[in-house]
Amino acid sequence: DQCSYCGIYCCPPKFCTSAGCRSP
């Protein structure tokens, strides 16, 4: 998977934003 870290780990289909991990 292409998980990102933005305060917490965030894996598709969720995505990182300036507010943290968001759902699509």
Swiss-Prot record:
Entry's localization field: Secreted
Main subcellular location: secreted
Cysteine pairings via disulfide bonds: 3-11, 6-16, 10-21
Keywords: Amidation, Disulfide bond, Secreted, Toxin
Any GO molecular function: toxin activity
Positions of post-translational Proline amide modification: 24
Entry superkingdom: Eukaryota
Tissue: Expressed by the venom duct.
GO cellular component, one term: extracellular region
Domain-related comment: The cysteine framework is VI/VII (C-C-CC-C-C).
Remarks, miscellaneous: Negative results: does not show effect on Nav1.1, Nav1.2, Nav1.3, Nav1.4, Nav1.5, Nav1.6, Nav1.7. Does not show effect on Kv1.1, Kv1.3, Kv1.4, Kv1.5, Kv1.6 and Kv3.1.
Function of the molecule: 1 uM of this toxin does not show any effect on voltage-gated sodium and potassium channels. Shows a turbid zone of antibacterial activity against the Gram-positive strain Bacillus megaterium (ATCC13632), but does not show antibacterial activity against other Gram-positive bacteria, and on Gram-negative bacteria.
Protein name, UniProt field: Conotoxin Lo6/7a
Organism (species): Conasprella longurionis
